[in-house]
From Swiss-Prot:
Taxonomic classification: Bacteria, Pseudomonadati, Pseudomonadota, Alphaproteobacteria, Rhodobacterales
Xref: PROSITE patterns: YJEF_N (PS51385)
Cofactor note: Binds 1 potassium ion per subunit.
Domain called YjeF N-terminal: residue spans: 10-212
Organism this protein belongs to: Rhodobacter capsulatus (strain ATCC BAA-309 / NBRC 16581 / SB1003)
Listed name of the protein: NAD(P)H-hydrate epimerase
Residues that hold K(+) according to the record: 66, 129, 164
Keywords of the record: Isomerase, Metal-binding, NAD, NADP, Nucleotide-binding, Potassium
Length: 212
């Protein structure tokens, strides 16, 4: 039987890896971003440069380490020839240290715009949802127009860990929380309780190792 980890379990594993010196937080973030880019190439080979003309990824980065993963994805996709548009929800000065480091690395090669209230996703070949991951403990407010715009655009959406708005631990009281549309979720090391719900809804789930 496949092992399922709660969000607390996953954070404990990451902290243990960092404390033991087996990996730094930055290294884990880099591995996660690289795993997402690998999953993109596997899931959508038809939109992978250079086999086709320049492709456009829109990446939505949030205020935590999920957003940090998104900055890594942006940098690595650009290196592979993608056009990248990156939006940040929140203030750069309030990002956790590892996420801020990857924000700064991206800023040296690309631009960052504040996340609009209702973005236009019509030009995107792929949207990466790196807004909120495993740490969400409350329903999101104010994201309805963003999620609606994403749904109406009909573009492929890859979520890092989980679609933003989902509770990783699938608690009963979180069943009605609003969440982003999603085509594929890429999570790391092991599935979390919410991934069974995604599969039941016909959403793809890929688990990638990051050396934990």
């Amino acid at each position: 039987m496949t092992e399922i980890l709660t969000s607390d379990d996953m954070r404990s594993l990451e902290r243990a890896a960092i404390a033991s010196g087996r990996a730094s937080g930055l290294e884990l973030m880099e591995r996660a971003g690289a795993a997402v880019v690998e999953a993109i190439a596997e899931a959508w080979p038809d939109i992978r440069p250079p086999a086709v003309a320049l492709r456009h990824a829109m990446i939505l980065c949030g205020p935590g380490n999920n957003g940090g993963d998104g900055f890594v994805v942006a940098r690595l996709l650009r290196r592979r020839g993608w056009k990248v548009t990156l939006y940040l929800y929140g203030e750069a000065d309030r990002l956790p240290p590892d996420a801020r480091a990857n924000h700064d690395r991206w800023r040296r090669i690309g631009t960052i715009a504040p996340l609009p209230a209702a973005p236009d996703f019509s030009s995107a070949d792929l949207v990466v949802d790196a807004l909120f991951g495993l740490g969400l403990t409350r329903p999101l407010t104010g994201f309805g127009p963003i999620f609606a715009a994403l749904a109406s655009a009909g573009r492929p959406v890859l979520a890092i860990d989980l679609p933003s708005g989902r509770d990783a631990d699938a608690r009963a009281d979180a069943a009605g929380w609003p969440s982003a549309p999603c085509s594929l979720a890429v999570t790391f090391h092991r599935e979390k309780p919410a991934h069974a719900q995604l599969r039941a809804e016909g959403i793809g789930v890929i688990v990638k190792p990051i050396g934990l």
